[in-house]
């Protein structure tokens, strides 16, 4: 068979369930470097679109790389359509974005994509910062999230700090965090999963709160003391996998949290500074 036929017969195009748009590292387990293997462990196909490409996270003594140029980034997205690789697409997830212009490019691509995929699940992890570090992305990214991605998302997964930035509301107690999350809900944005709500410090618990228009569910997990990076990226990968495998939202959140705890403990047992995925036991 000629190479011309092999690479131009679109009926042969590789298909994916998920397009994951976020950071990638050469060394380490953050962004798509942890999300892609986690999604594949769940038996789903995924295309990874990088927003930044780094040697490793900046927490090490040295790191190299940076944001993907807009021309490349838009080309990566466009190529998936040119290859006719999105016929079976079910979800798009976003994580760490390198620039506000990437967010705008992505939003334009998603808007066009939804015309052919009206049931597409768009899940946004609005990576902005955290309480300990403050904002650790470019200062124009929060407004870009508000303007371009939140209006397209069906679900978002902010931590408490990110929820405060997106809403401009104080969220340091559970009731105020829930109220802030509800203020973001719309005809499009159906749910908010708050990934670091106030937990019980004495009982070493942390809480994840699932907020929708008609329900609020608080899920408590054991708190694991760790400096491991990429746990939020892993959580989102597990969450989207659970949803696509037919789990209800709250159940998918609960299972995702348990999987993250399992991975963290497994990693600690192996004395690694980077997350290690153990085999996935099918529940």
Curated annotation (Swiss-Prot):
Substrate binds at residues 23, 59, 233. GO terms for molecular function: ATP binding; hydroxymethylpyrimidine kinase activity; magnesium ion binding; pyridoxal kinase activity; zinc ion binding. The keyword Lipid metabolism does not apply. GO terms for biological process: pyridoxal 5'-phosphate salvage. Pathway: Cofactor metabolism; pyridoxal 5'-phosphate salvage; pyridoxal 5'-phosphate from pyridoxal: step 1/1; Cofactor metabolism; pyridoxal 5'-phosphate salvage; pyridoxine 5'-phosphate from pyridoxine: step 1/1; Cofactor metabolism; pyridoxal 5'-phosphate salvage; pyridoxamine 5'-phosphate from pyridoxamine: step 1/1. It catalyses: pyridoxal + ATP = pyridoxal 5'-phosphate + ADP + H(+); pyridoxine + ATP = pyridoxine 5'-phosphate + ADP + H(+); pyridoxamine + ATP = pyridoxamine 5'-phosphate + ADP + H(+). Its EC number is 2.7.1.35. The keyword Metal-binding applies. Mg(2+) binds at residues 136, 162. GO terms for cellular component: cytosol. Its cofactor is Mg(2+). It comes from the Bacteria. ATP binds at residues 125, 157, 162, 195, 221-224, 231. Keywords: ATP-binding, Kinase, Magnesium, Metal-binding, Nucleotide-binding, Transferase, Zinc. Pfam families: Phos_pyr_kin. InterPro entries: PdxK (IPR023479), PM/HMP-P_kinase-1 (IPR013749), PyrdxlKinase (IPR004625), Ribokinase-like (IPR029056). Homodimer. B6-vitamer kinase involved in the salvage pathway of pyridoxal 5'-phosphate (PLP). Catalyzes the phosphorylation of pyridoxine (PN), pyridoxal (PL), and pyridoxamine (PM), forming their respective 5'-phosphorylated esters, i.e. PNP, PLP and PMP. Belongs to the pyridoxine kinase family. PdxK subfamily. This is Pyridoxine/pyridoxal/pyridoxamine kinase. It comes from Escherichia coli O1:K1 / APEC.
